[in-house]
Amino acid sequence: MEVIGKSKAKAIIESHLNDSVIYFSDHVRILKHNPYCTSVSYLKDHGVYQWVFQVNDPRENPITAVFFVEQNEEHIDLNGNTPAGPLSSEEPLPPGTLSGKCIRWVNSPKVPDVELKEKHTFVGQANTRICLYHLDDQRTEVHFETDITLDFELSFPLNMMPENILKFMTEAIMSKIMQQATESMLCQVQSDICCSGAELTASGCKI
């Protein structure tokens, strides 16, 4: 059964763009702020990062989700629009943008041949776009959005239920998990680089 989860976040941080880029380019550091992420590692031989997440199904049975992603960076064209992301199309740049950079975590087109040790382990797909906009007063506006897709099998007796009901239940849980993870990561960003709480918003949604 395939389920999809999505989340969006925006924040104004009291940090110069150059410092913000260094912070958000630290792939391992950012992912370790996610309370459901148990491991992040760079597979040098394959040129990809491996994420390992641990969640529970509706009956509290553990599920291990593994993702393989590549990290890319690109400059934002001030004469153009915000680069399209996994959840949104191109849109105008935030008012007052002086410069910007976009960091992407893109699902690897090829799954590396690595051993998956945990039981009930499933390989998913993940795509993230982090846009960083340099504003005045040494501030950076951050637009963070991500979506994940996971195709997995549920244990008995859940697998005896109608799939449409299972899908609804599972995606509701996925939505809750991603909302909690987004809020947790934003709180950690706030702690690390003095994020302005009054200008921080987060939202999660499901399909």
What are these regions (language model features)?
Residues M1-D77, N81-L87, L93:
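Hydrophobic ligand-binding cavity/cleft-lining segments
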Residues K6-K10, K32, K44, K101, ...:
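Context-gated lysine
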Residues D57-Q71, L132-H134, S191-K206:
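A broadly tuned preference for mixed-charge, low-complexity surface segments
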Residues N81-A172:
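Beta-strand/loop substructures that line and gate deep hydrophobic ligand-binding cavities in soluble
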Residues L158-I207:
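A conserved amphipathic terminal alpha-helix motif
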